[in-house]
Amino acid sequence: LLFGLGYRLGGWVSSDKRKSPVYYACSLLAGTLKGYLEQNRFDAVVTPHLYPAETLTAMKKKGWLKIPVVAIGTDYTCIPFWEETDCDCYIVPQKDLLGELIHKGLPKKQLFPLGIPVKQAFSTQKKRSLARKLCRLPSDAHVYLVMSGSMGYGDCAETVQHITNAGVDFQILA
């Protein structure tokens, strides 16, 4: 409920014309991060979250950051405030999201729909029967993957309740 309200308020405040309270809060960390980046002399910064992207944007605006910033989006929607960031490129989870990001004000030439980087082990194909055996799943049961991030998805318990009410034989893994 709280995160949903935050998203709605963020969508109302969010604009590529003005900065949000989120930007100003994140910019308070710019001085500390500046020292760390100068001390370690990185070639680029890669960030998988909006908050450090906001901090890095504040640093760029002050002339404190001269190295490229790469933002990796891990949401399948344009969350509020990405449009007020100034990253050199944005890795987008999927190409279907490009229109939404462009509409919100992110520059098309800086958007790269390359997916969310994951550990190589997740890309390894396994036979379904072997995967079920490794996970101790019955070979004939329906399998539903219900997962959520830290905010925005909604009520996972309600989704599972709908599956339960559908009268389908399934097993819950927790």
What would you call each of these model-derived segments?
Residues 1-40:
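Conserved N-terminal ligand/cofactor-binding loop architecture of enzyme catalytic domains
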Residues 36-43, 137-139:
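Glycine-rich phosphate-binding loop signature in dinucleotide/nucleotide-binding domains
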Residues 37, 80-90:
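A conserved, positively charged/aromatic
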Residues 43-44, 89, 143, 171:
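Structural motif
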Residues 44-49, 53, 57-75:
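Active-site proximal beta-strand in glycosyltransferases
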Residues 65-68, 107-109, 168-170:
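A short helix->loop->beta-strand "cap" motif at the edges of active sites that frequently abuts
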Residues 88-150:
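A nucleotide-sugar donor-handling region in carbohydrate enzymes
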Residues 134-174:
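Conserved catalytic-core segment of nucleotide-activated headgroup transferases in glycan assembly
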